Regions:
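N-terminal secretory signal peptides that target proteins for export/translocation
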Residues: 1-8
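Extracellular glycoside hydrolase catalytic/binding regions
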Residues: 43-48, 63-65, 70-74, 149-153, ...
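Aromatic-lined substrate-binding rim segments of carbohydrate-active enzymes
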Residues: 74-142, 149, 153-163, 167, ...
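Sec-dependent N-terminal signal peptides
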Residues: 8-16
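N-terminal carbohydrate-binding accessory modules
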Residues: 31-89, 97, 103-106, 342, ...
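C-terminal motif of bacterial Sec signal peptides marking the signal peptidase cleavage site
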Residues: 22-25
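A short acidic, helix-capping loop that chelates divalent metal ions and anchors anionic groups
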Residues: 96-100, 140-143, 188-192, 323-325
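Bacterial signal peptide processing site
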Residues: 27-29
Length: 353
C-alpha cells in the first residue's frame, strides 16, 4: 500500500521515504497509441486469463491472499498456511538492486534484500502463487523514489527499469506460478499531472510488451488501474484495447477510500460485476483499513468480494501492533482491536470462509 495524498504519495515501510515526483508533459487524448503486438501463442498452462476470467487448469478460480515484505526477510510459512493464504504479492522496494537469485545483498540504501527466487521457492513449497511487484527505485546514492503516483515513462530511470524487468522475466519465464506486475499504483490520485487514459494505454502497452519481448515468457502480467491504482476508468475505457493481440493480462485495482467510503455491499457488487461483465479480468491487489485518513469500514467490501468471487489480497502481512493495516501483532497473533476495526480477525475470517 502506498498512501494517497494530494500531490504526494508515500509509504511507511521500515522508514518513511518522501517521494519527489518528476512530472513531465504527456500524451493528449488525441494521440493514437502504438499498434498492439500480435505474438500471442495459444493460451495454455496452469494459470491463464481467458474471456475476462482468471483460470487455473482451465477452471475459474478465486484466490485469497496478502501483500508481503519478504524481500526484507522470509516470513513464517506455517503461520501463513494456518491463515489459508493462497497468493502473495511481494513488495520490491529497490528494483534496481533487488537480487533475483543467489544470496541476500546489502544495497546502497543500507538495507539487506533477499533474492526473489528464494521467496518464490518458499511460496511454491506452500502452494502459494507469487506476484512480483516493483514499488520503488533506489539510485546510486541510496535515495529511494517510490513508484506510486508517478507517470512511468516520464521517469529518468525508465529505461533502466525496463532492463531490470526483462531480467526478472527472463529468470522466471518457465515458472507459471510467478506473475509479474508492471508498476505499483501509477498516476496522480485525481488524474492530474498530465494524466489521460491514452497515456495509460501507451504506457501499459510499452511495459507489457517489454516483458513479452523476453522469448518464452508467457506467464500472467498484471496491469494496474489509474488514480494510484484505485480507479477502473482506464480499464473500462482502454482495457480491451490493451488486451487486443496480447494474452494472459490480469488487471489490478486497490480498495481504499474510493471503494470503502460512501459505498454499500450492494453498490460494490454492482461495481465489481460491471468490470467482470465487460470482460476485464481483474483482482483487488490491495485492501486495507487505513490510508491517509481515519480507519475505514471494510466488511462490506469483503462481503462483495466473496459474492463476486473476486481474487483479493490484504495490505499487509506484517507483525506490527502499531500499524492498523498490519494483520499481525508483534508476537504473531491477529492484530484486531477496536482501533483498526478488528482487521486481523476480520480478514482471517474472509480467508477461511
Amino acid at each position: 500500500m502506498c498512501r494517497k495524498k494530494k500531490h504526494i504519495g508515500f509509504c511507511a515501510i521500515l522508514v518513511v521515504f518522501v517521494c519527489n515526483a518528476v512530472f513531465l508533459s504527456c500524451a493528449d487524448e488525441g494521440e493514437i497509441p502504438n499498434d498492439p503486438i500480435s505474438n500471442s501463442p495459444s493460451v495454455s498452462g496452469q494459470y491463464t486469463t481467458v474471456a475476462g476470467q482468471l483460470l487455473k487448469n482451465d477452471e475459474a478460480i478465486q484466490l485469497k491472499g496478502v501483500n508481503c515484505l519478504q524481500t526484507y526477510g522470509l516470513t513464517d510459512a506455517e503461520l501463513m498456511n494456518a491463515w489459508g493464504i493462497e497468493i502473495s504479492r511481494e513488495f520490491i522496494g529497490n528494483l534496481r538492486e533487488q537480487p533475483i537469485d543467489g544470496g541476500a545483498i546489502e544495497a546502497s540504501d543500507g538495507v539487506w534484500y533477499h533474492p526473489l527466487q528464494q521467496i518464490v521457492n518458499r511460496n511454491r513449497a506452500n502452494n502459494r502463487v507469487t506476484i512480483l511487484c516493483p514499488f520503488g527505485w533506489v539510485n546510486a546514492n541510496g535515495e529511494r523514489q517510490l513508484l506510486t503516483g508517478l507517470n512511468p515513462t516520464a521517469q529518468d530511470f525508465y529505461q533502466d527499469y525496463k532492463d531490470k524487468m526483462q531480467r526478472i522475466a527472463e529468470h522466471f519465464k518457465n515458472q507459471q506460478d510467478v506473475w509479474i506486475e508492471v508498476w505499483n499504483e501509477p498516476y496522480h490520485w485525481d488524474n492530474e499531472n498530465g494524466y489521460s487514459h491514452v497515456l495509460w494505454l501507451a504506457d501499459m502497452e510499452d511495459m507489457v510488451d517489454n516483458l513479452r519481448e523476453v522469448d518464452g515468457f508467457e506467464s500472467i502480467v498484471i496491469v494496474p488501474g489509474n488514480e494510484q491504482g484505485q480507479s477502473e476508468a482506464a480499464l473500462l475505457t482502454h482495457g480491451k484495447d490493451l488486451m487486443r493481440g496480447r494474452y494472459n493480462l490480469l488487471f489490478d485495482l486497490h480498495a481504499y477510500e474510493k471503494w470503502l467510503l460512501d459505498s454499500t455491499e450492494s453498490s460494490l457488487i454492482t461495481r465489481i460485476e460491471a468490470i467482470q461483465t465487460a470482460g476485464i479480468p481483474f483482482i483487488m491487489g490491495e485492501v486495507g483499513v487505513q490510508n491517509v485518513g481515519d480507519v475505514m469500514p471494510v466488511q462490506h467490501f469483503l462481503n462483495a468480494a466473496r459474492a463476486t468471487r473476486l481474487t483479493t489480497l490484504a495490505w499487509v502481512w506484517n507483525q506490527n501492533s502499531e500499524d492498523n493495516n498490519a494483520l499481525l501483532t508483534n508476537n504473531g497473533e491477529a492484530n484486531a482491536t477496536a482501533q483498526n476495526n478488528f482487521w486481523g480477525t476480520t480478514y482471517r475470517a474472509f480467508l477461511e470462509d
